[in-house]
Amino acid sequence: MQIDGLPAIGTFHHIGVATEGIAEAEGTYAALGYAREGDEFCDHAQGVRGVFIVGPGPRLELLEALGASNTLDPWLRAGSRMYHLAFEVDDLDGTLALARSRFQALVLRSPTPAPAFGGRHIAFVMLRNRAVIEFIEADRSAMPDQSNEPVRP
């Protein structure tokens, strides 16, 4: 995400979609060419169950409340389904500091391990325009080795 000449914040990952039921939403998106990517997950810390789907557009994360959780209620009551944009970042703490200092973002959830990402940490912020952004700690295992191996021509 490049804003006003600032360095890129991270790589776009997905749009979070609040649902009253994943199965029904998945059927709707299947008609648009979307299919499940990976297994369903439960995140008890956030009070949600979810699944990622991919298709002709951006990756979507379909979420529904776990049990009596009210995590998604504000968006569902307002009729807003797509409620957050997610970006994978190399430096989660640095990105949060930048979001707070440059964008006056409010941290909604401090870094916490997320089952959806194999325990990698995530954090949520709200920008002044009330947009909710999720930052996902980059997958270090997928990054190139930064050891002191000699550079080959």
Stretches with model-predicted labels:
Residues M1-H13, V17-E37, V54-L108, G118-P153:
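Glyoxalase I/VOC metalloenzyme domain signal
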Residues R36-H44, T112-A114:
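Conserved catalytic-core motifs of GNAT/GCN5-like acyltransferases
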Residues H44-V48, A116-R120:
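Short acidic/glycine-enriched loop/turn segments that link adjacent beta-strands
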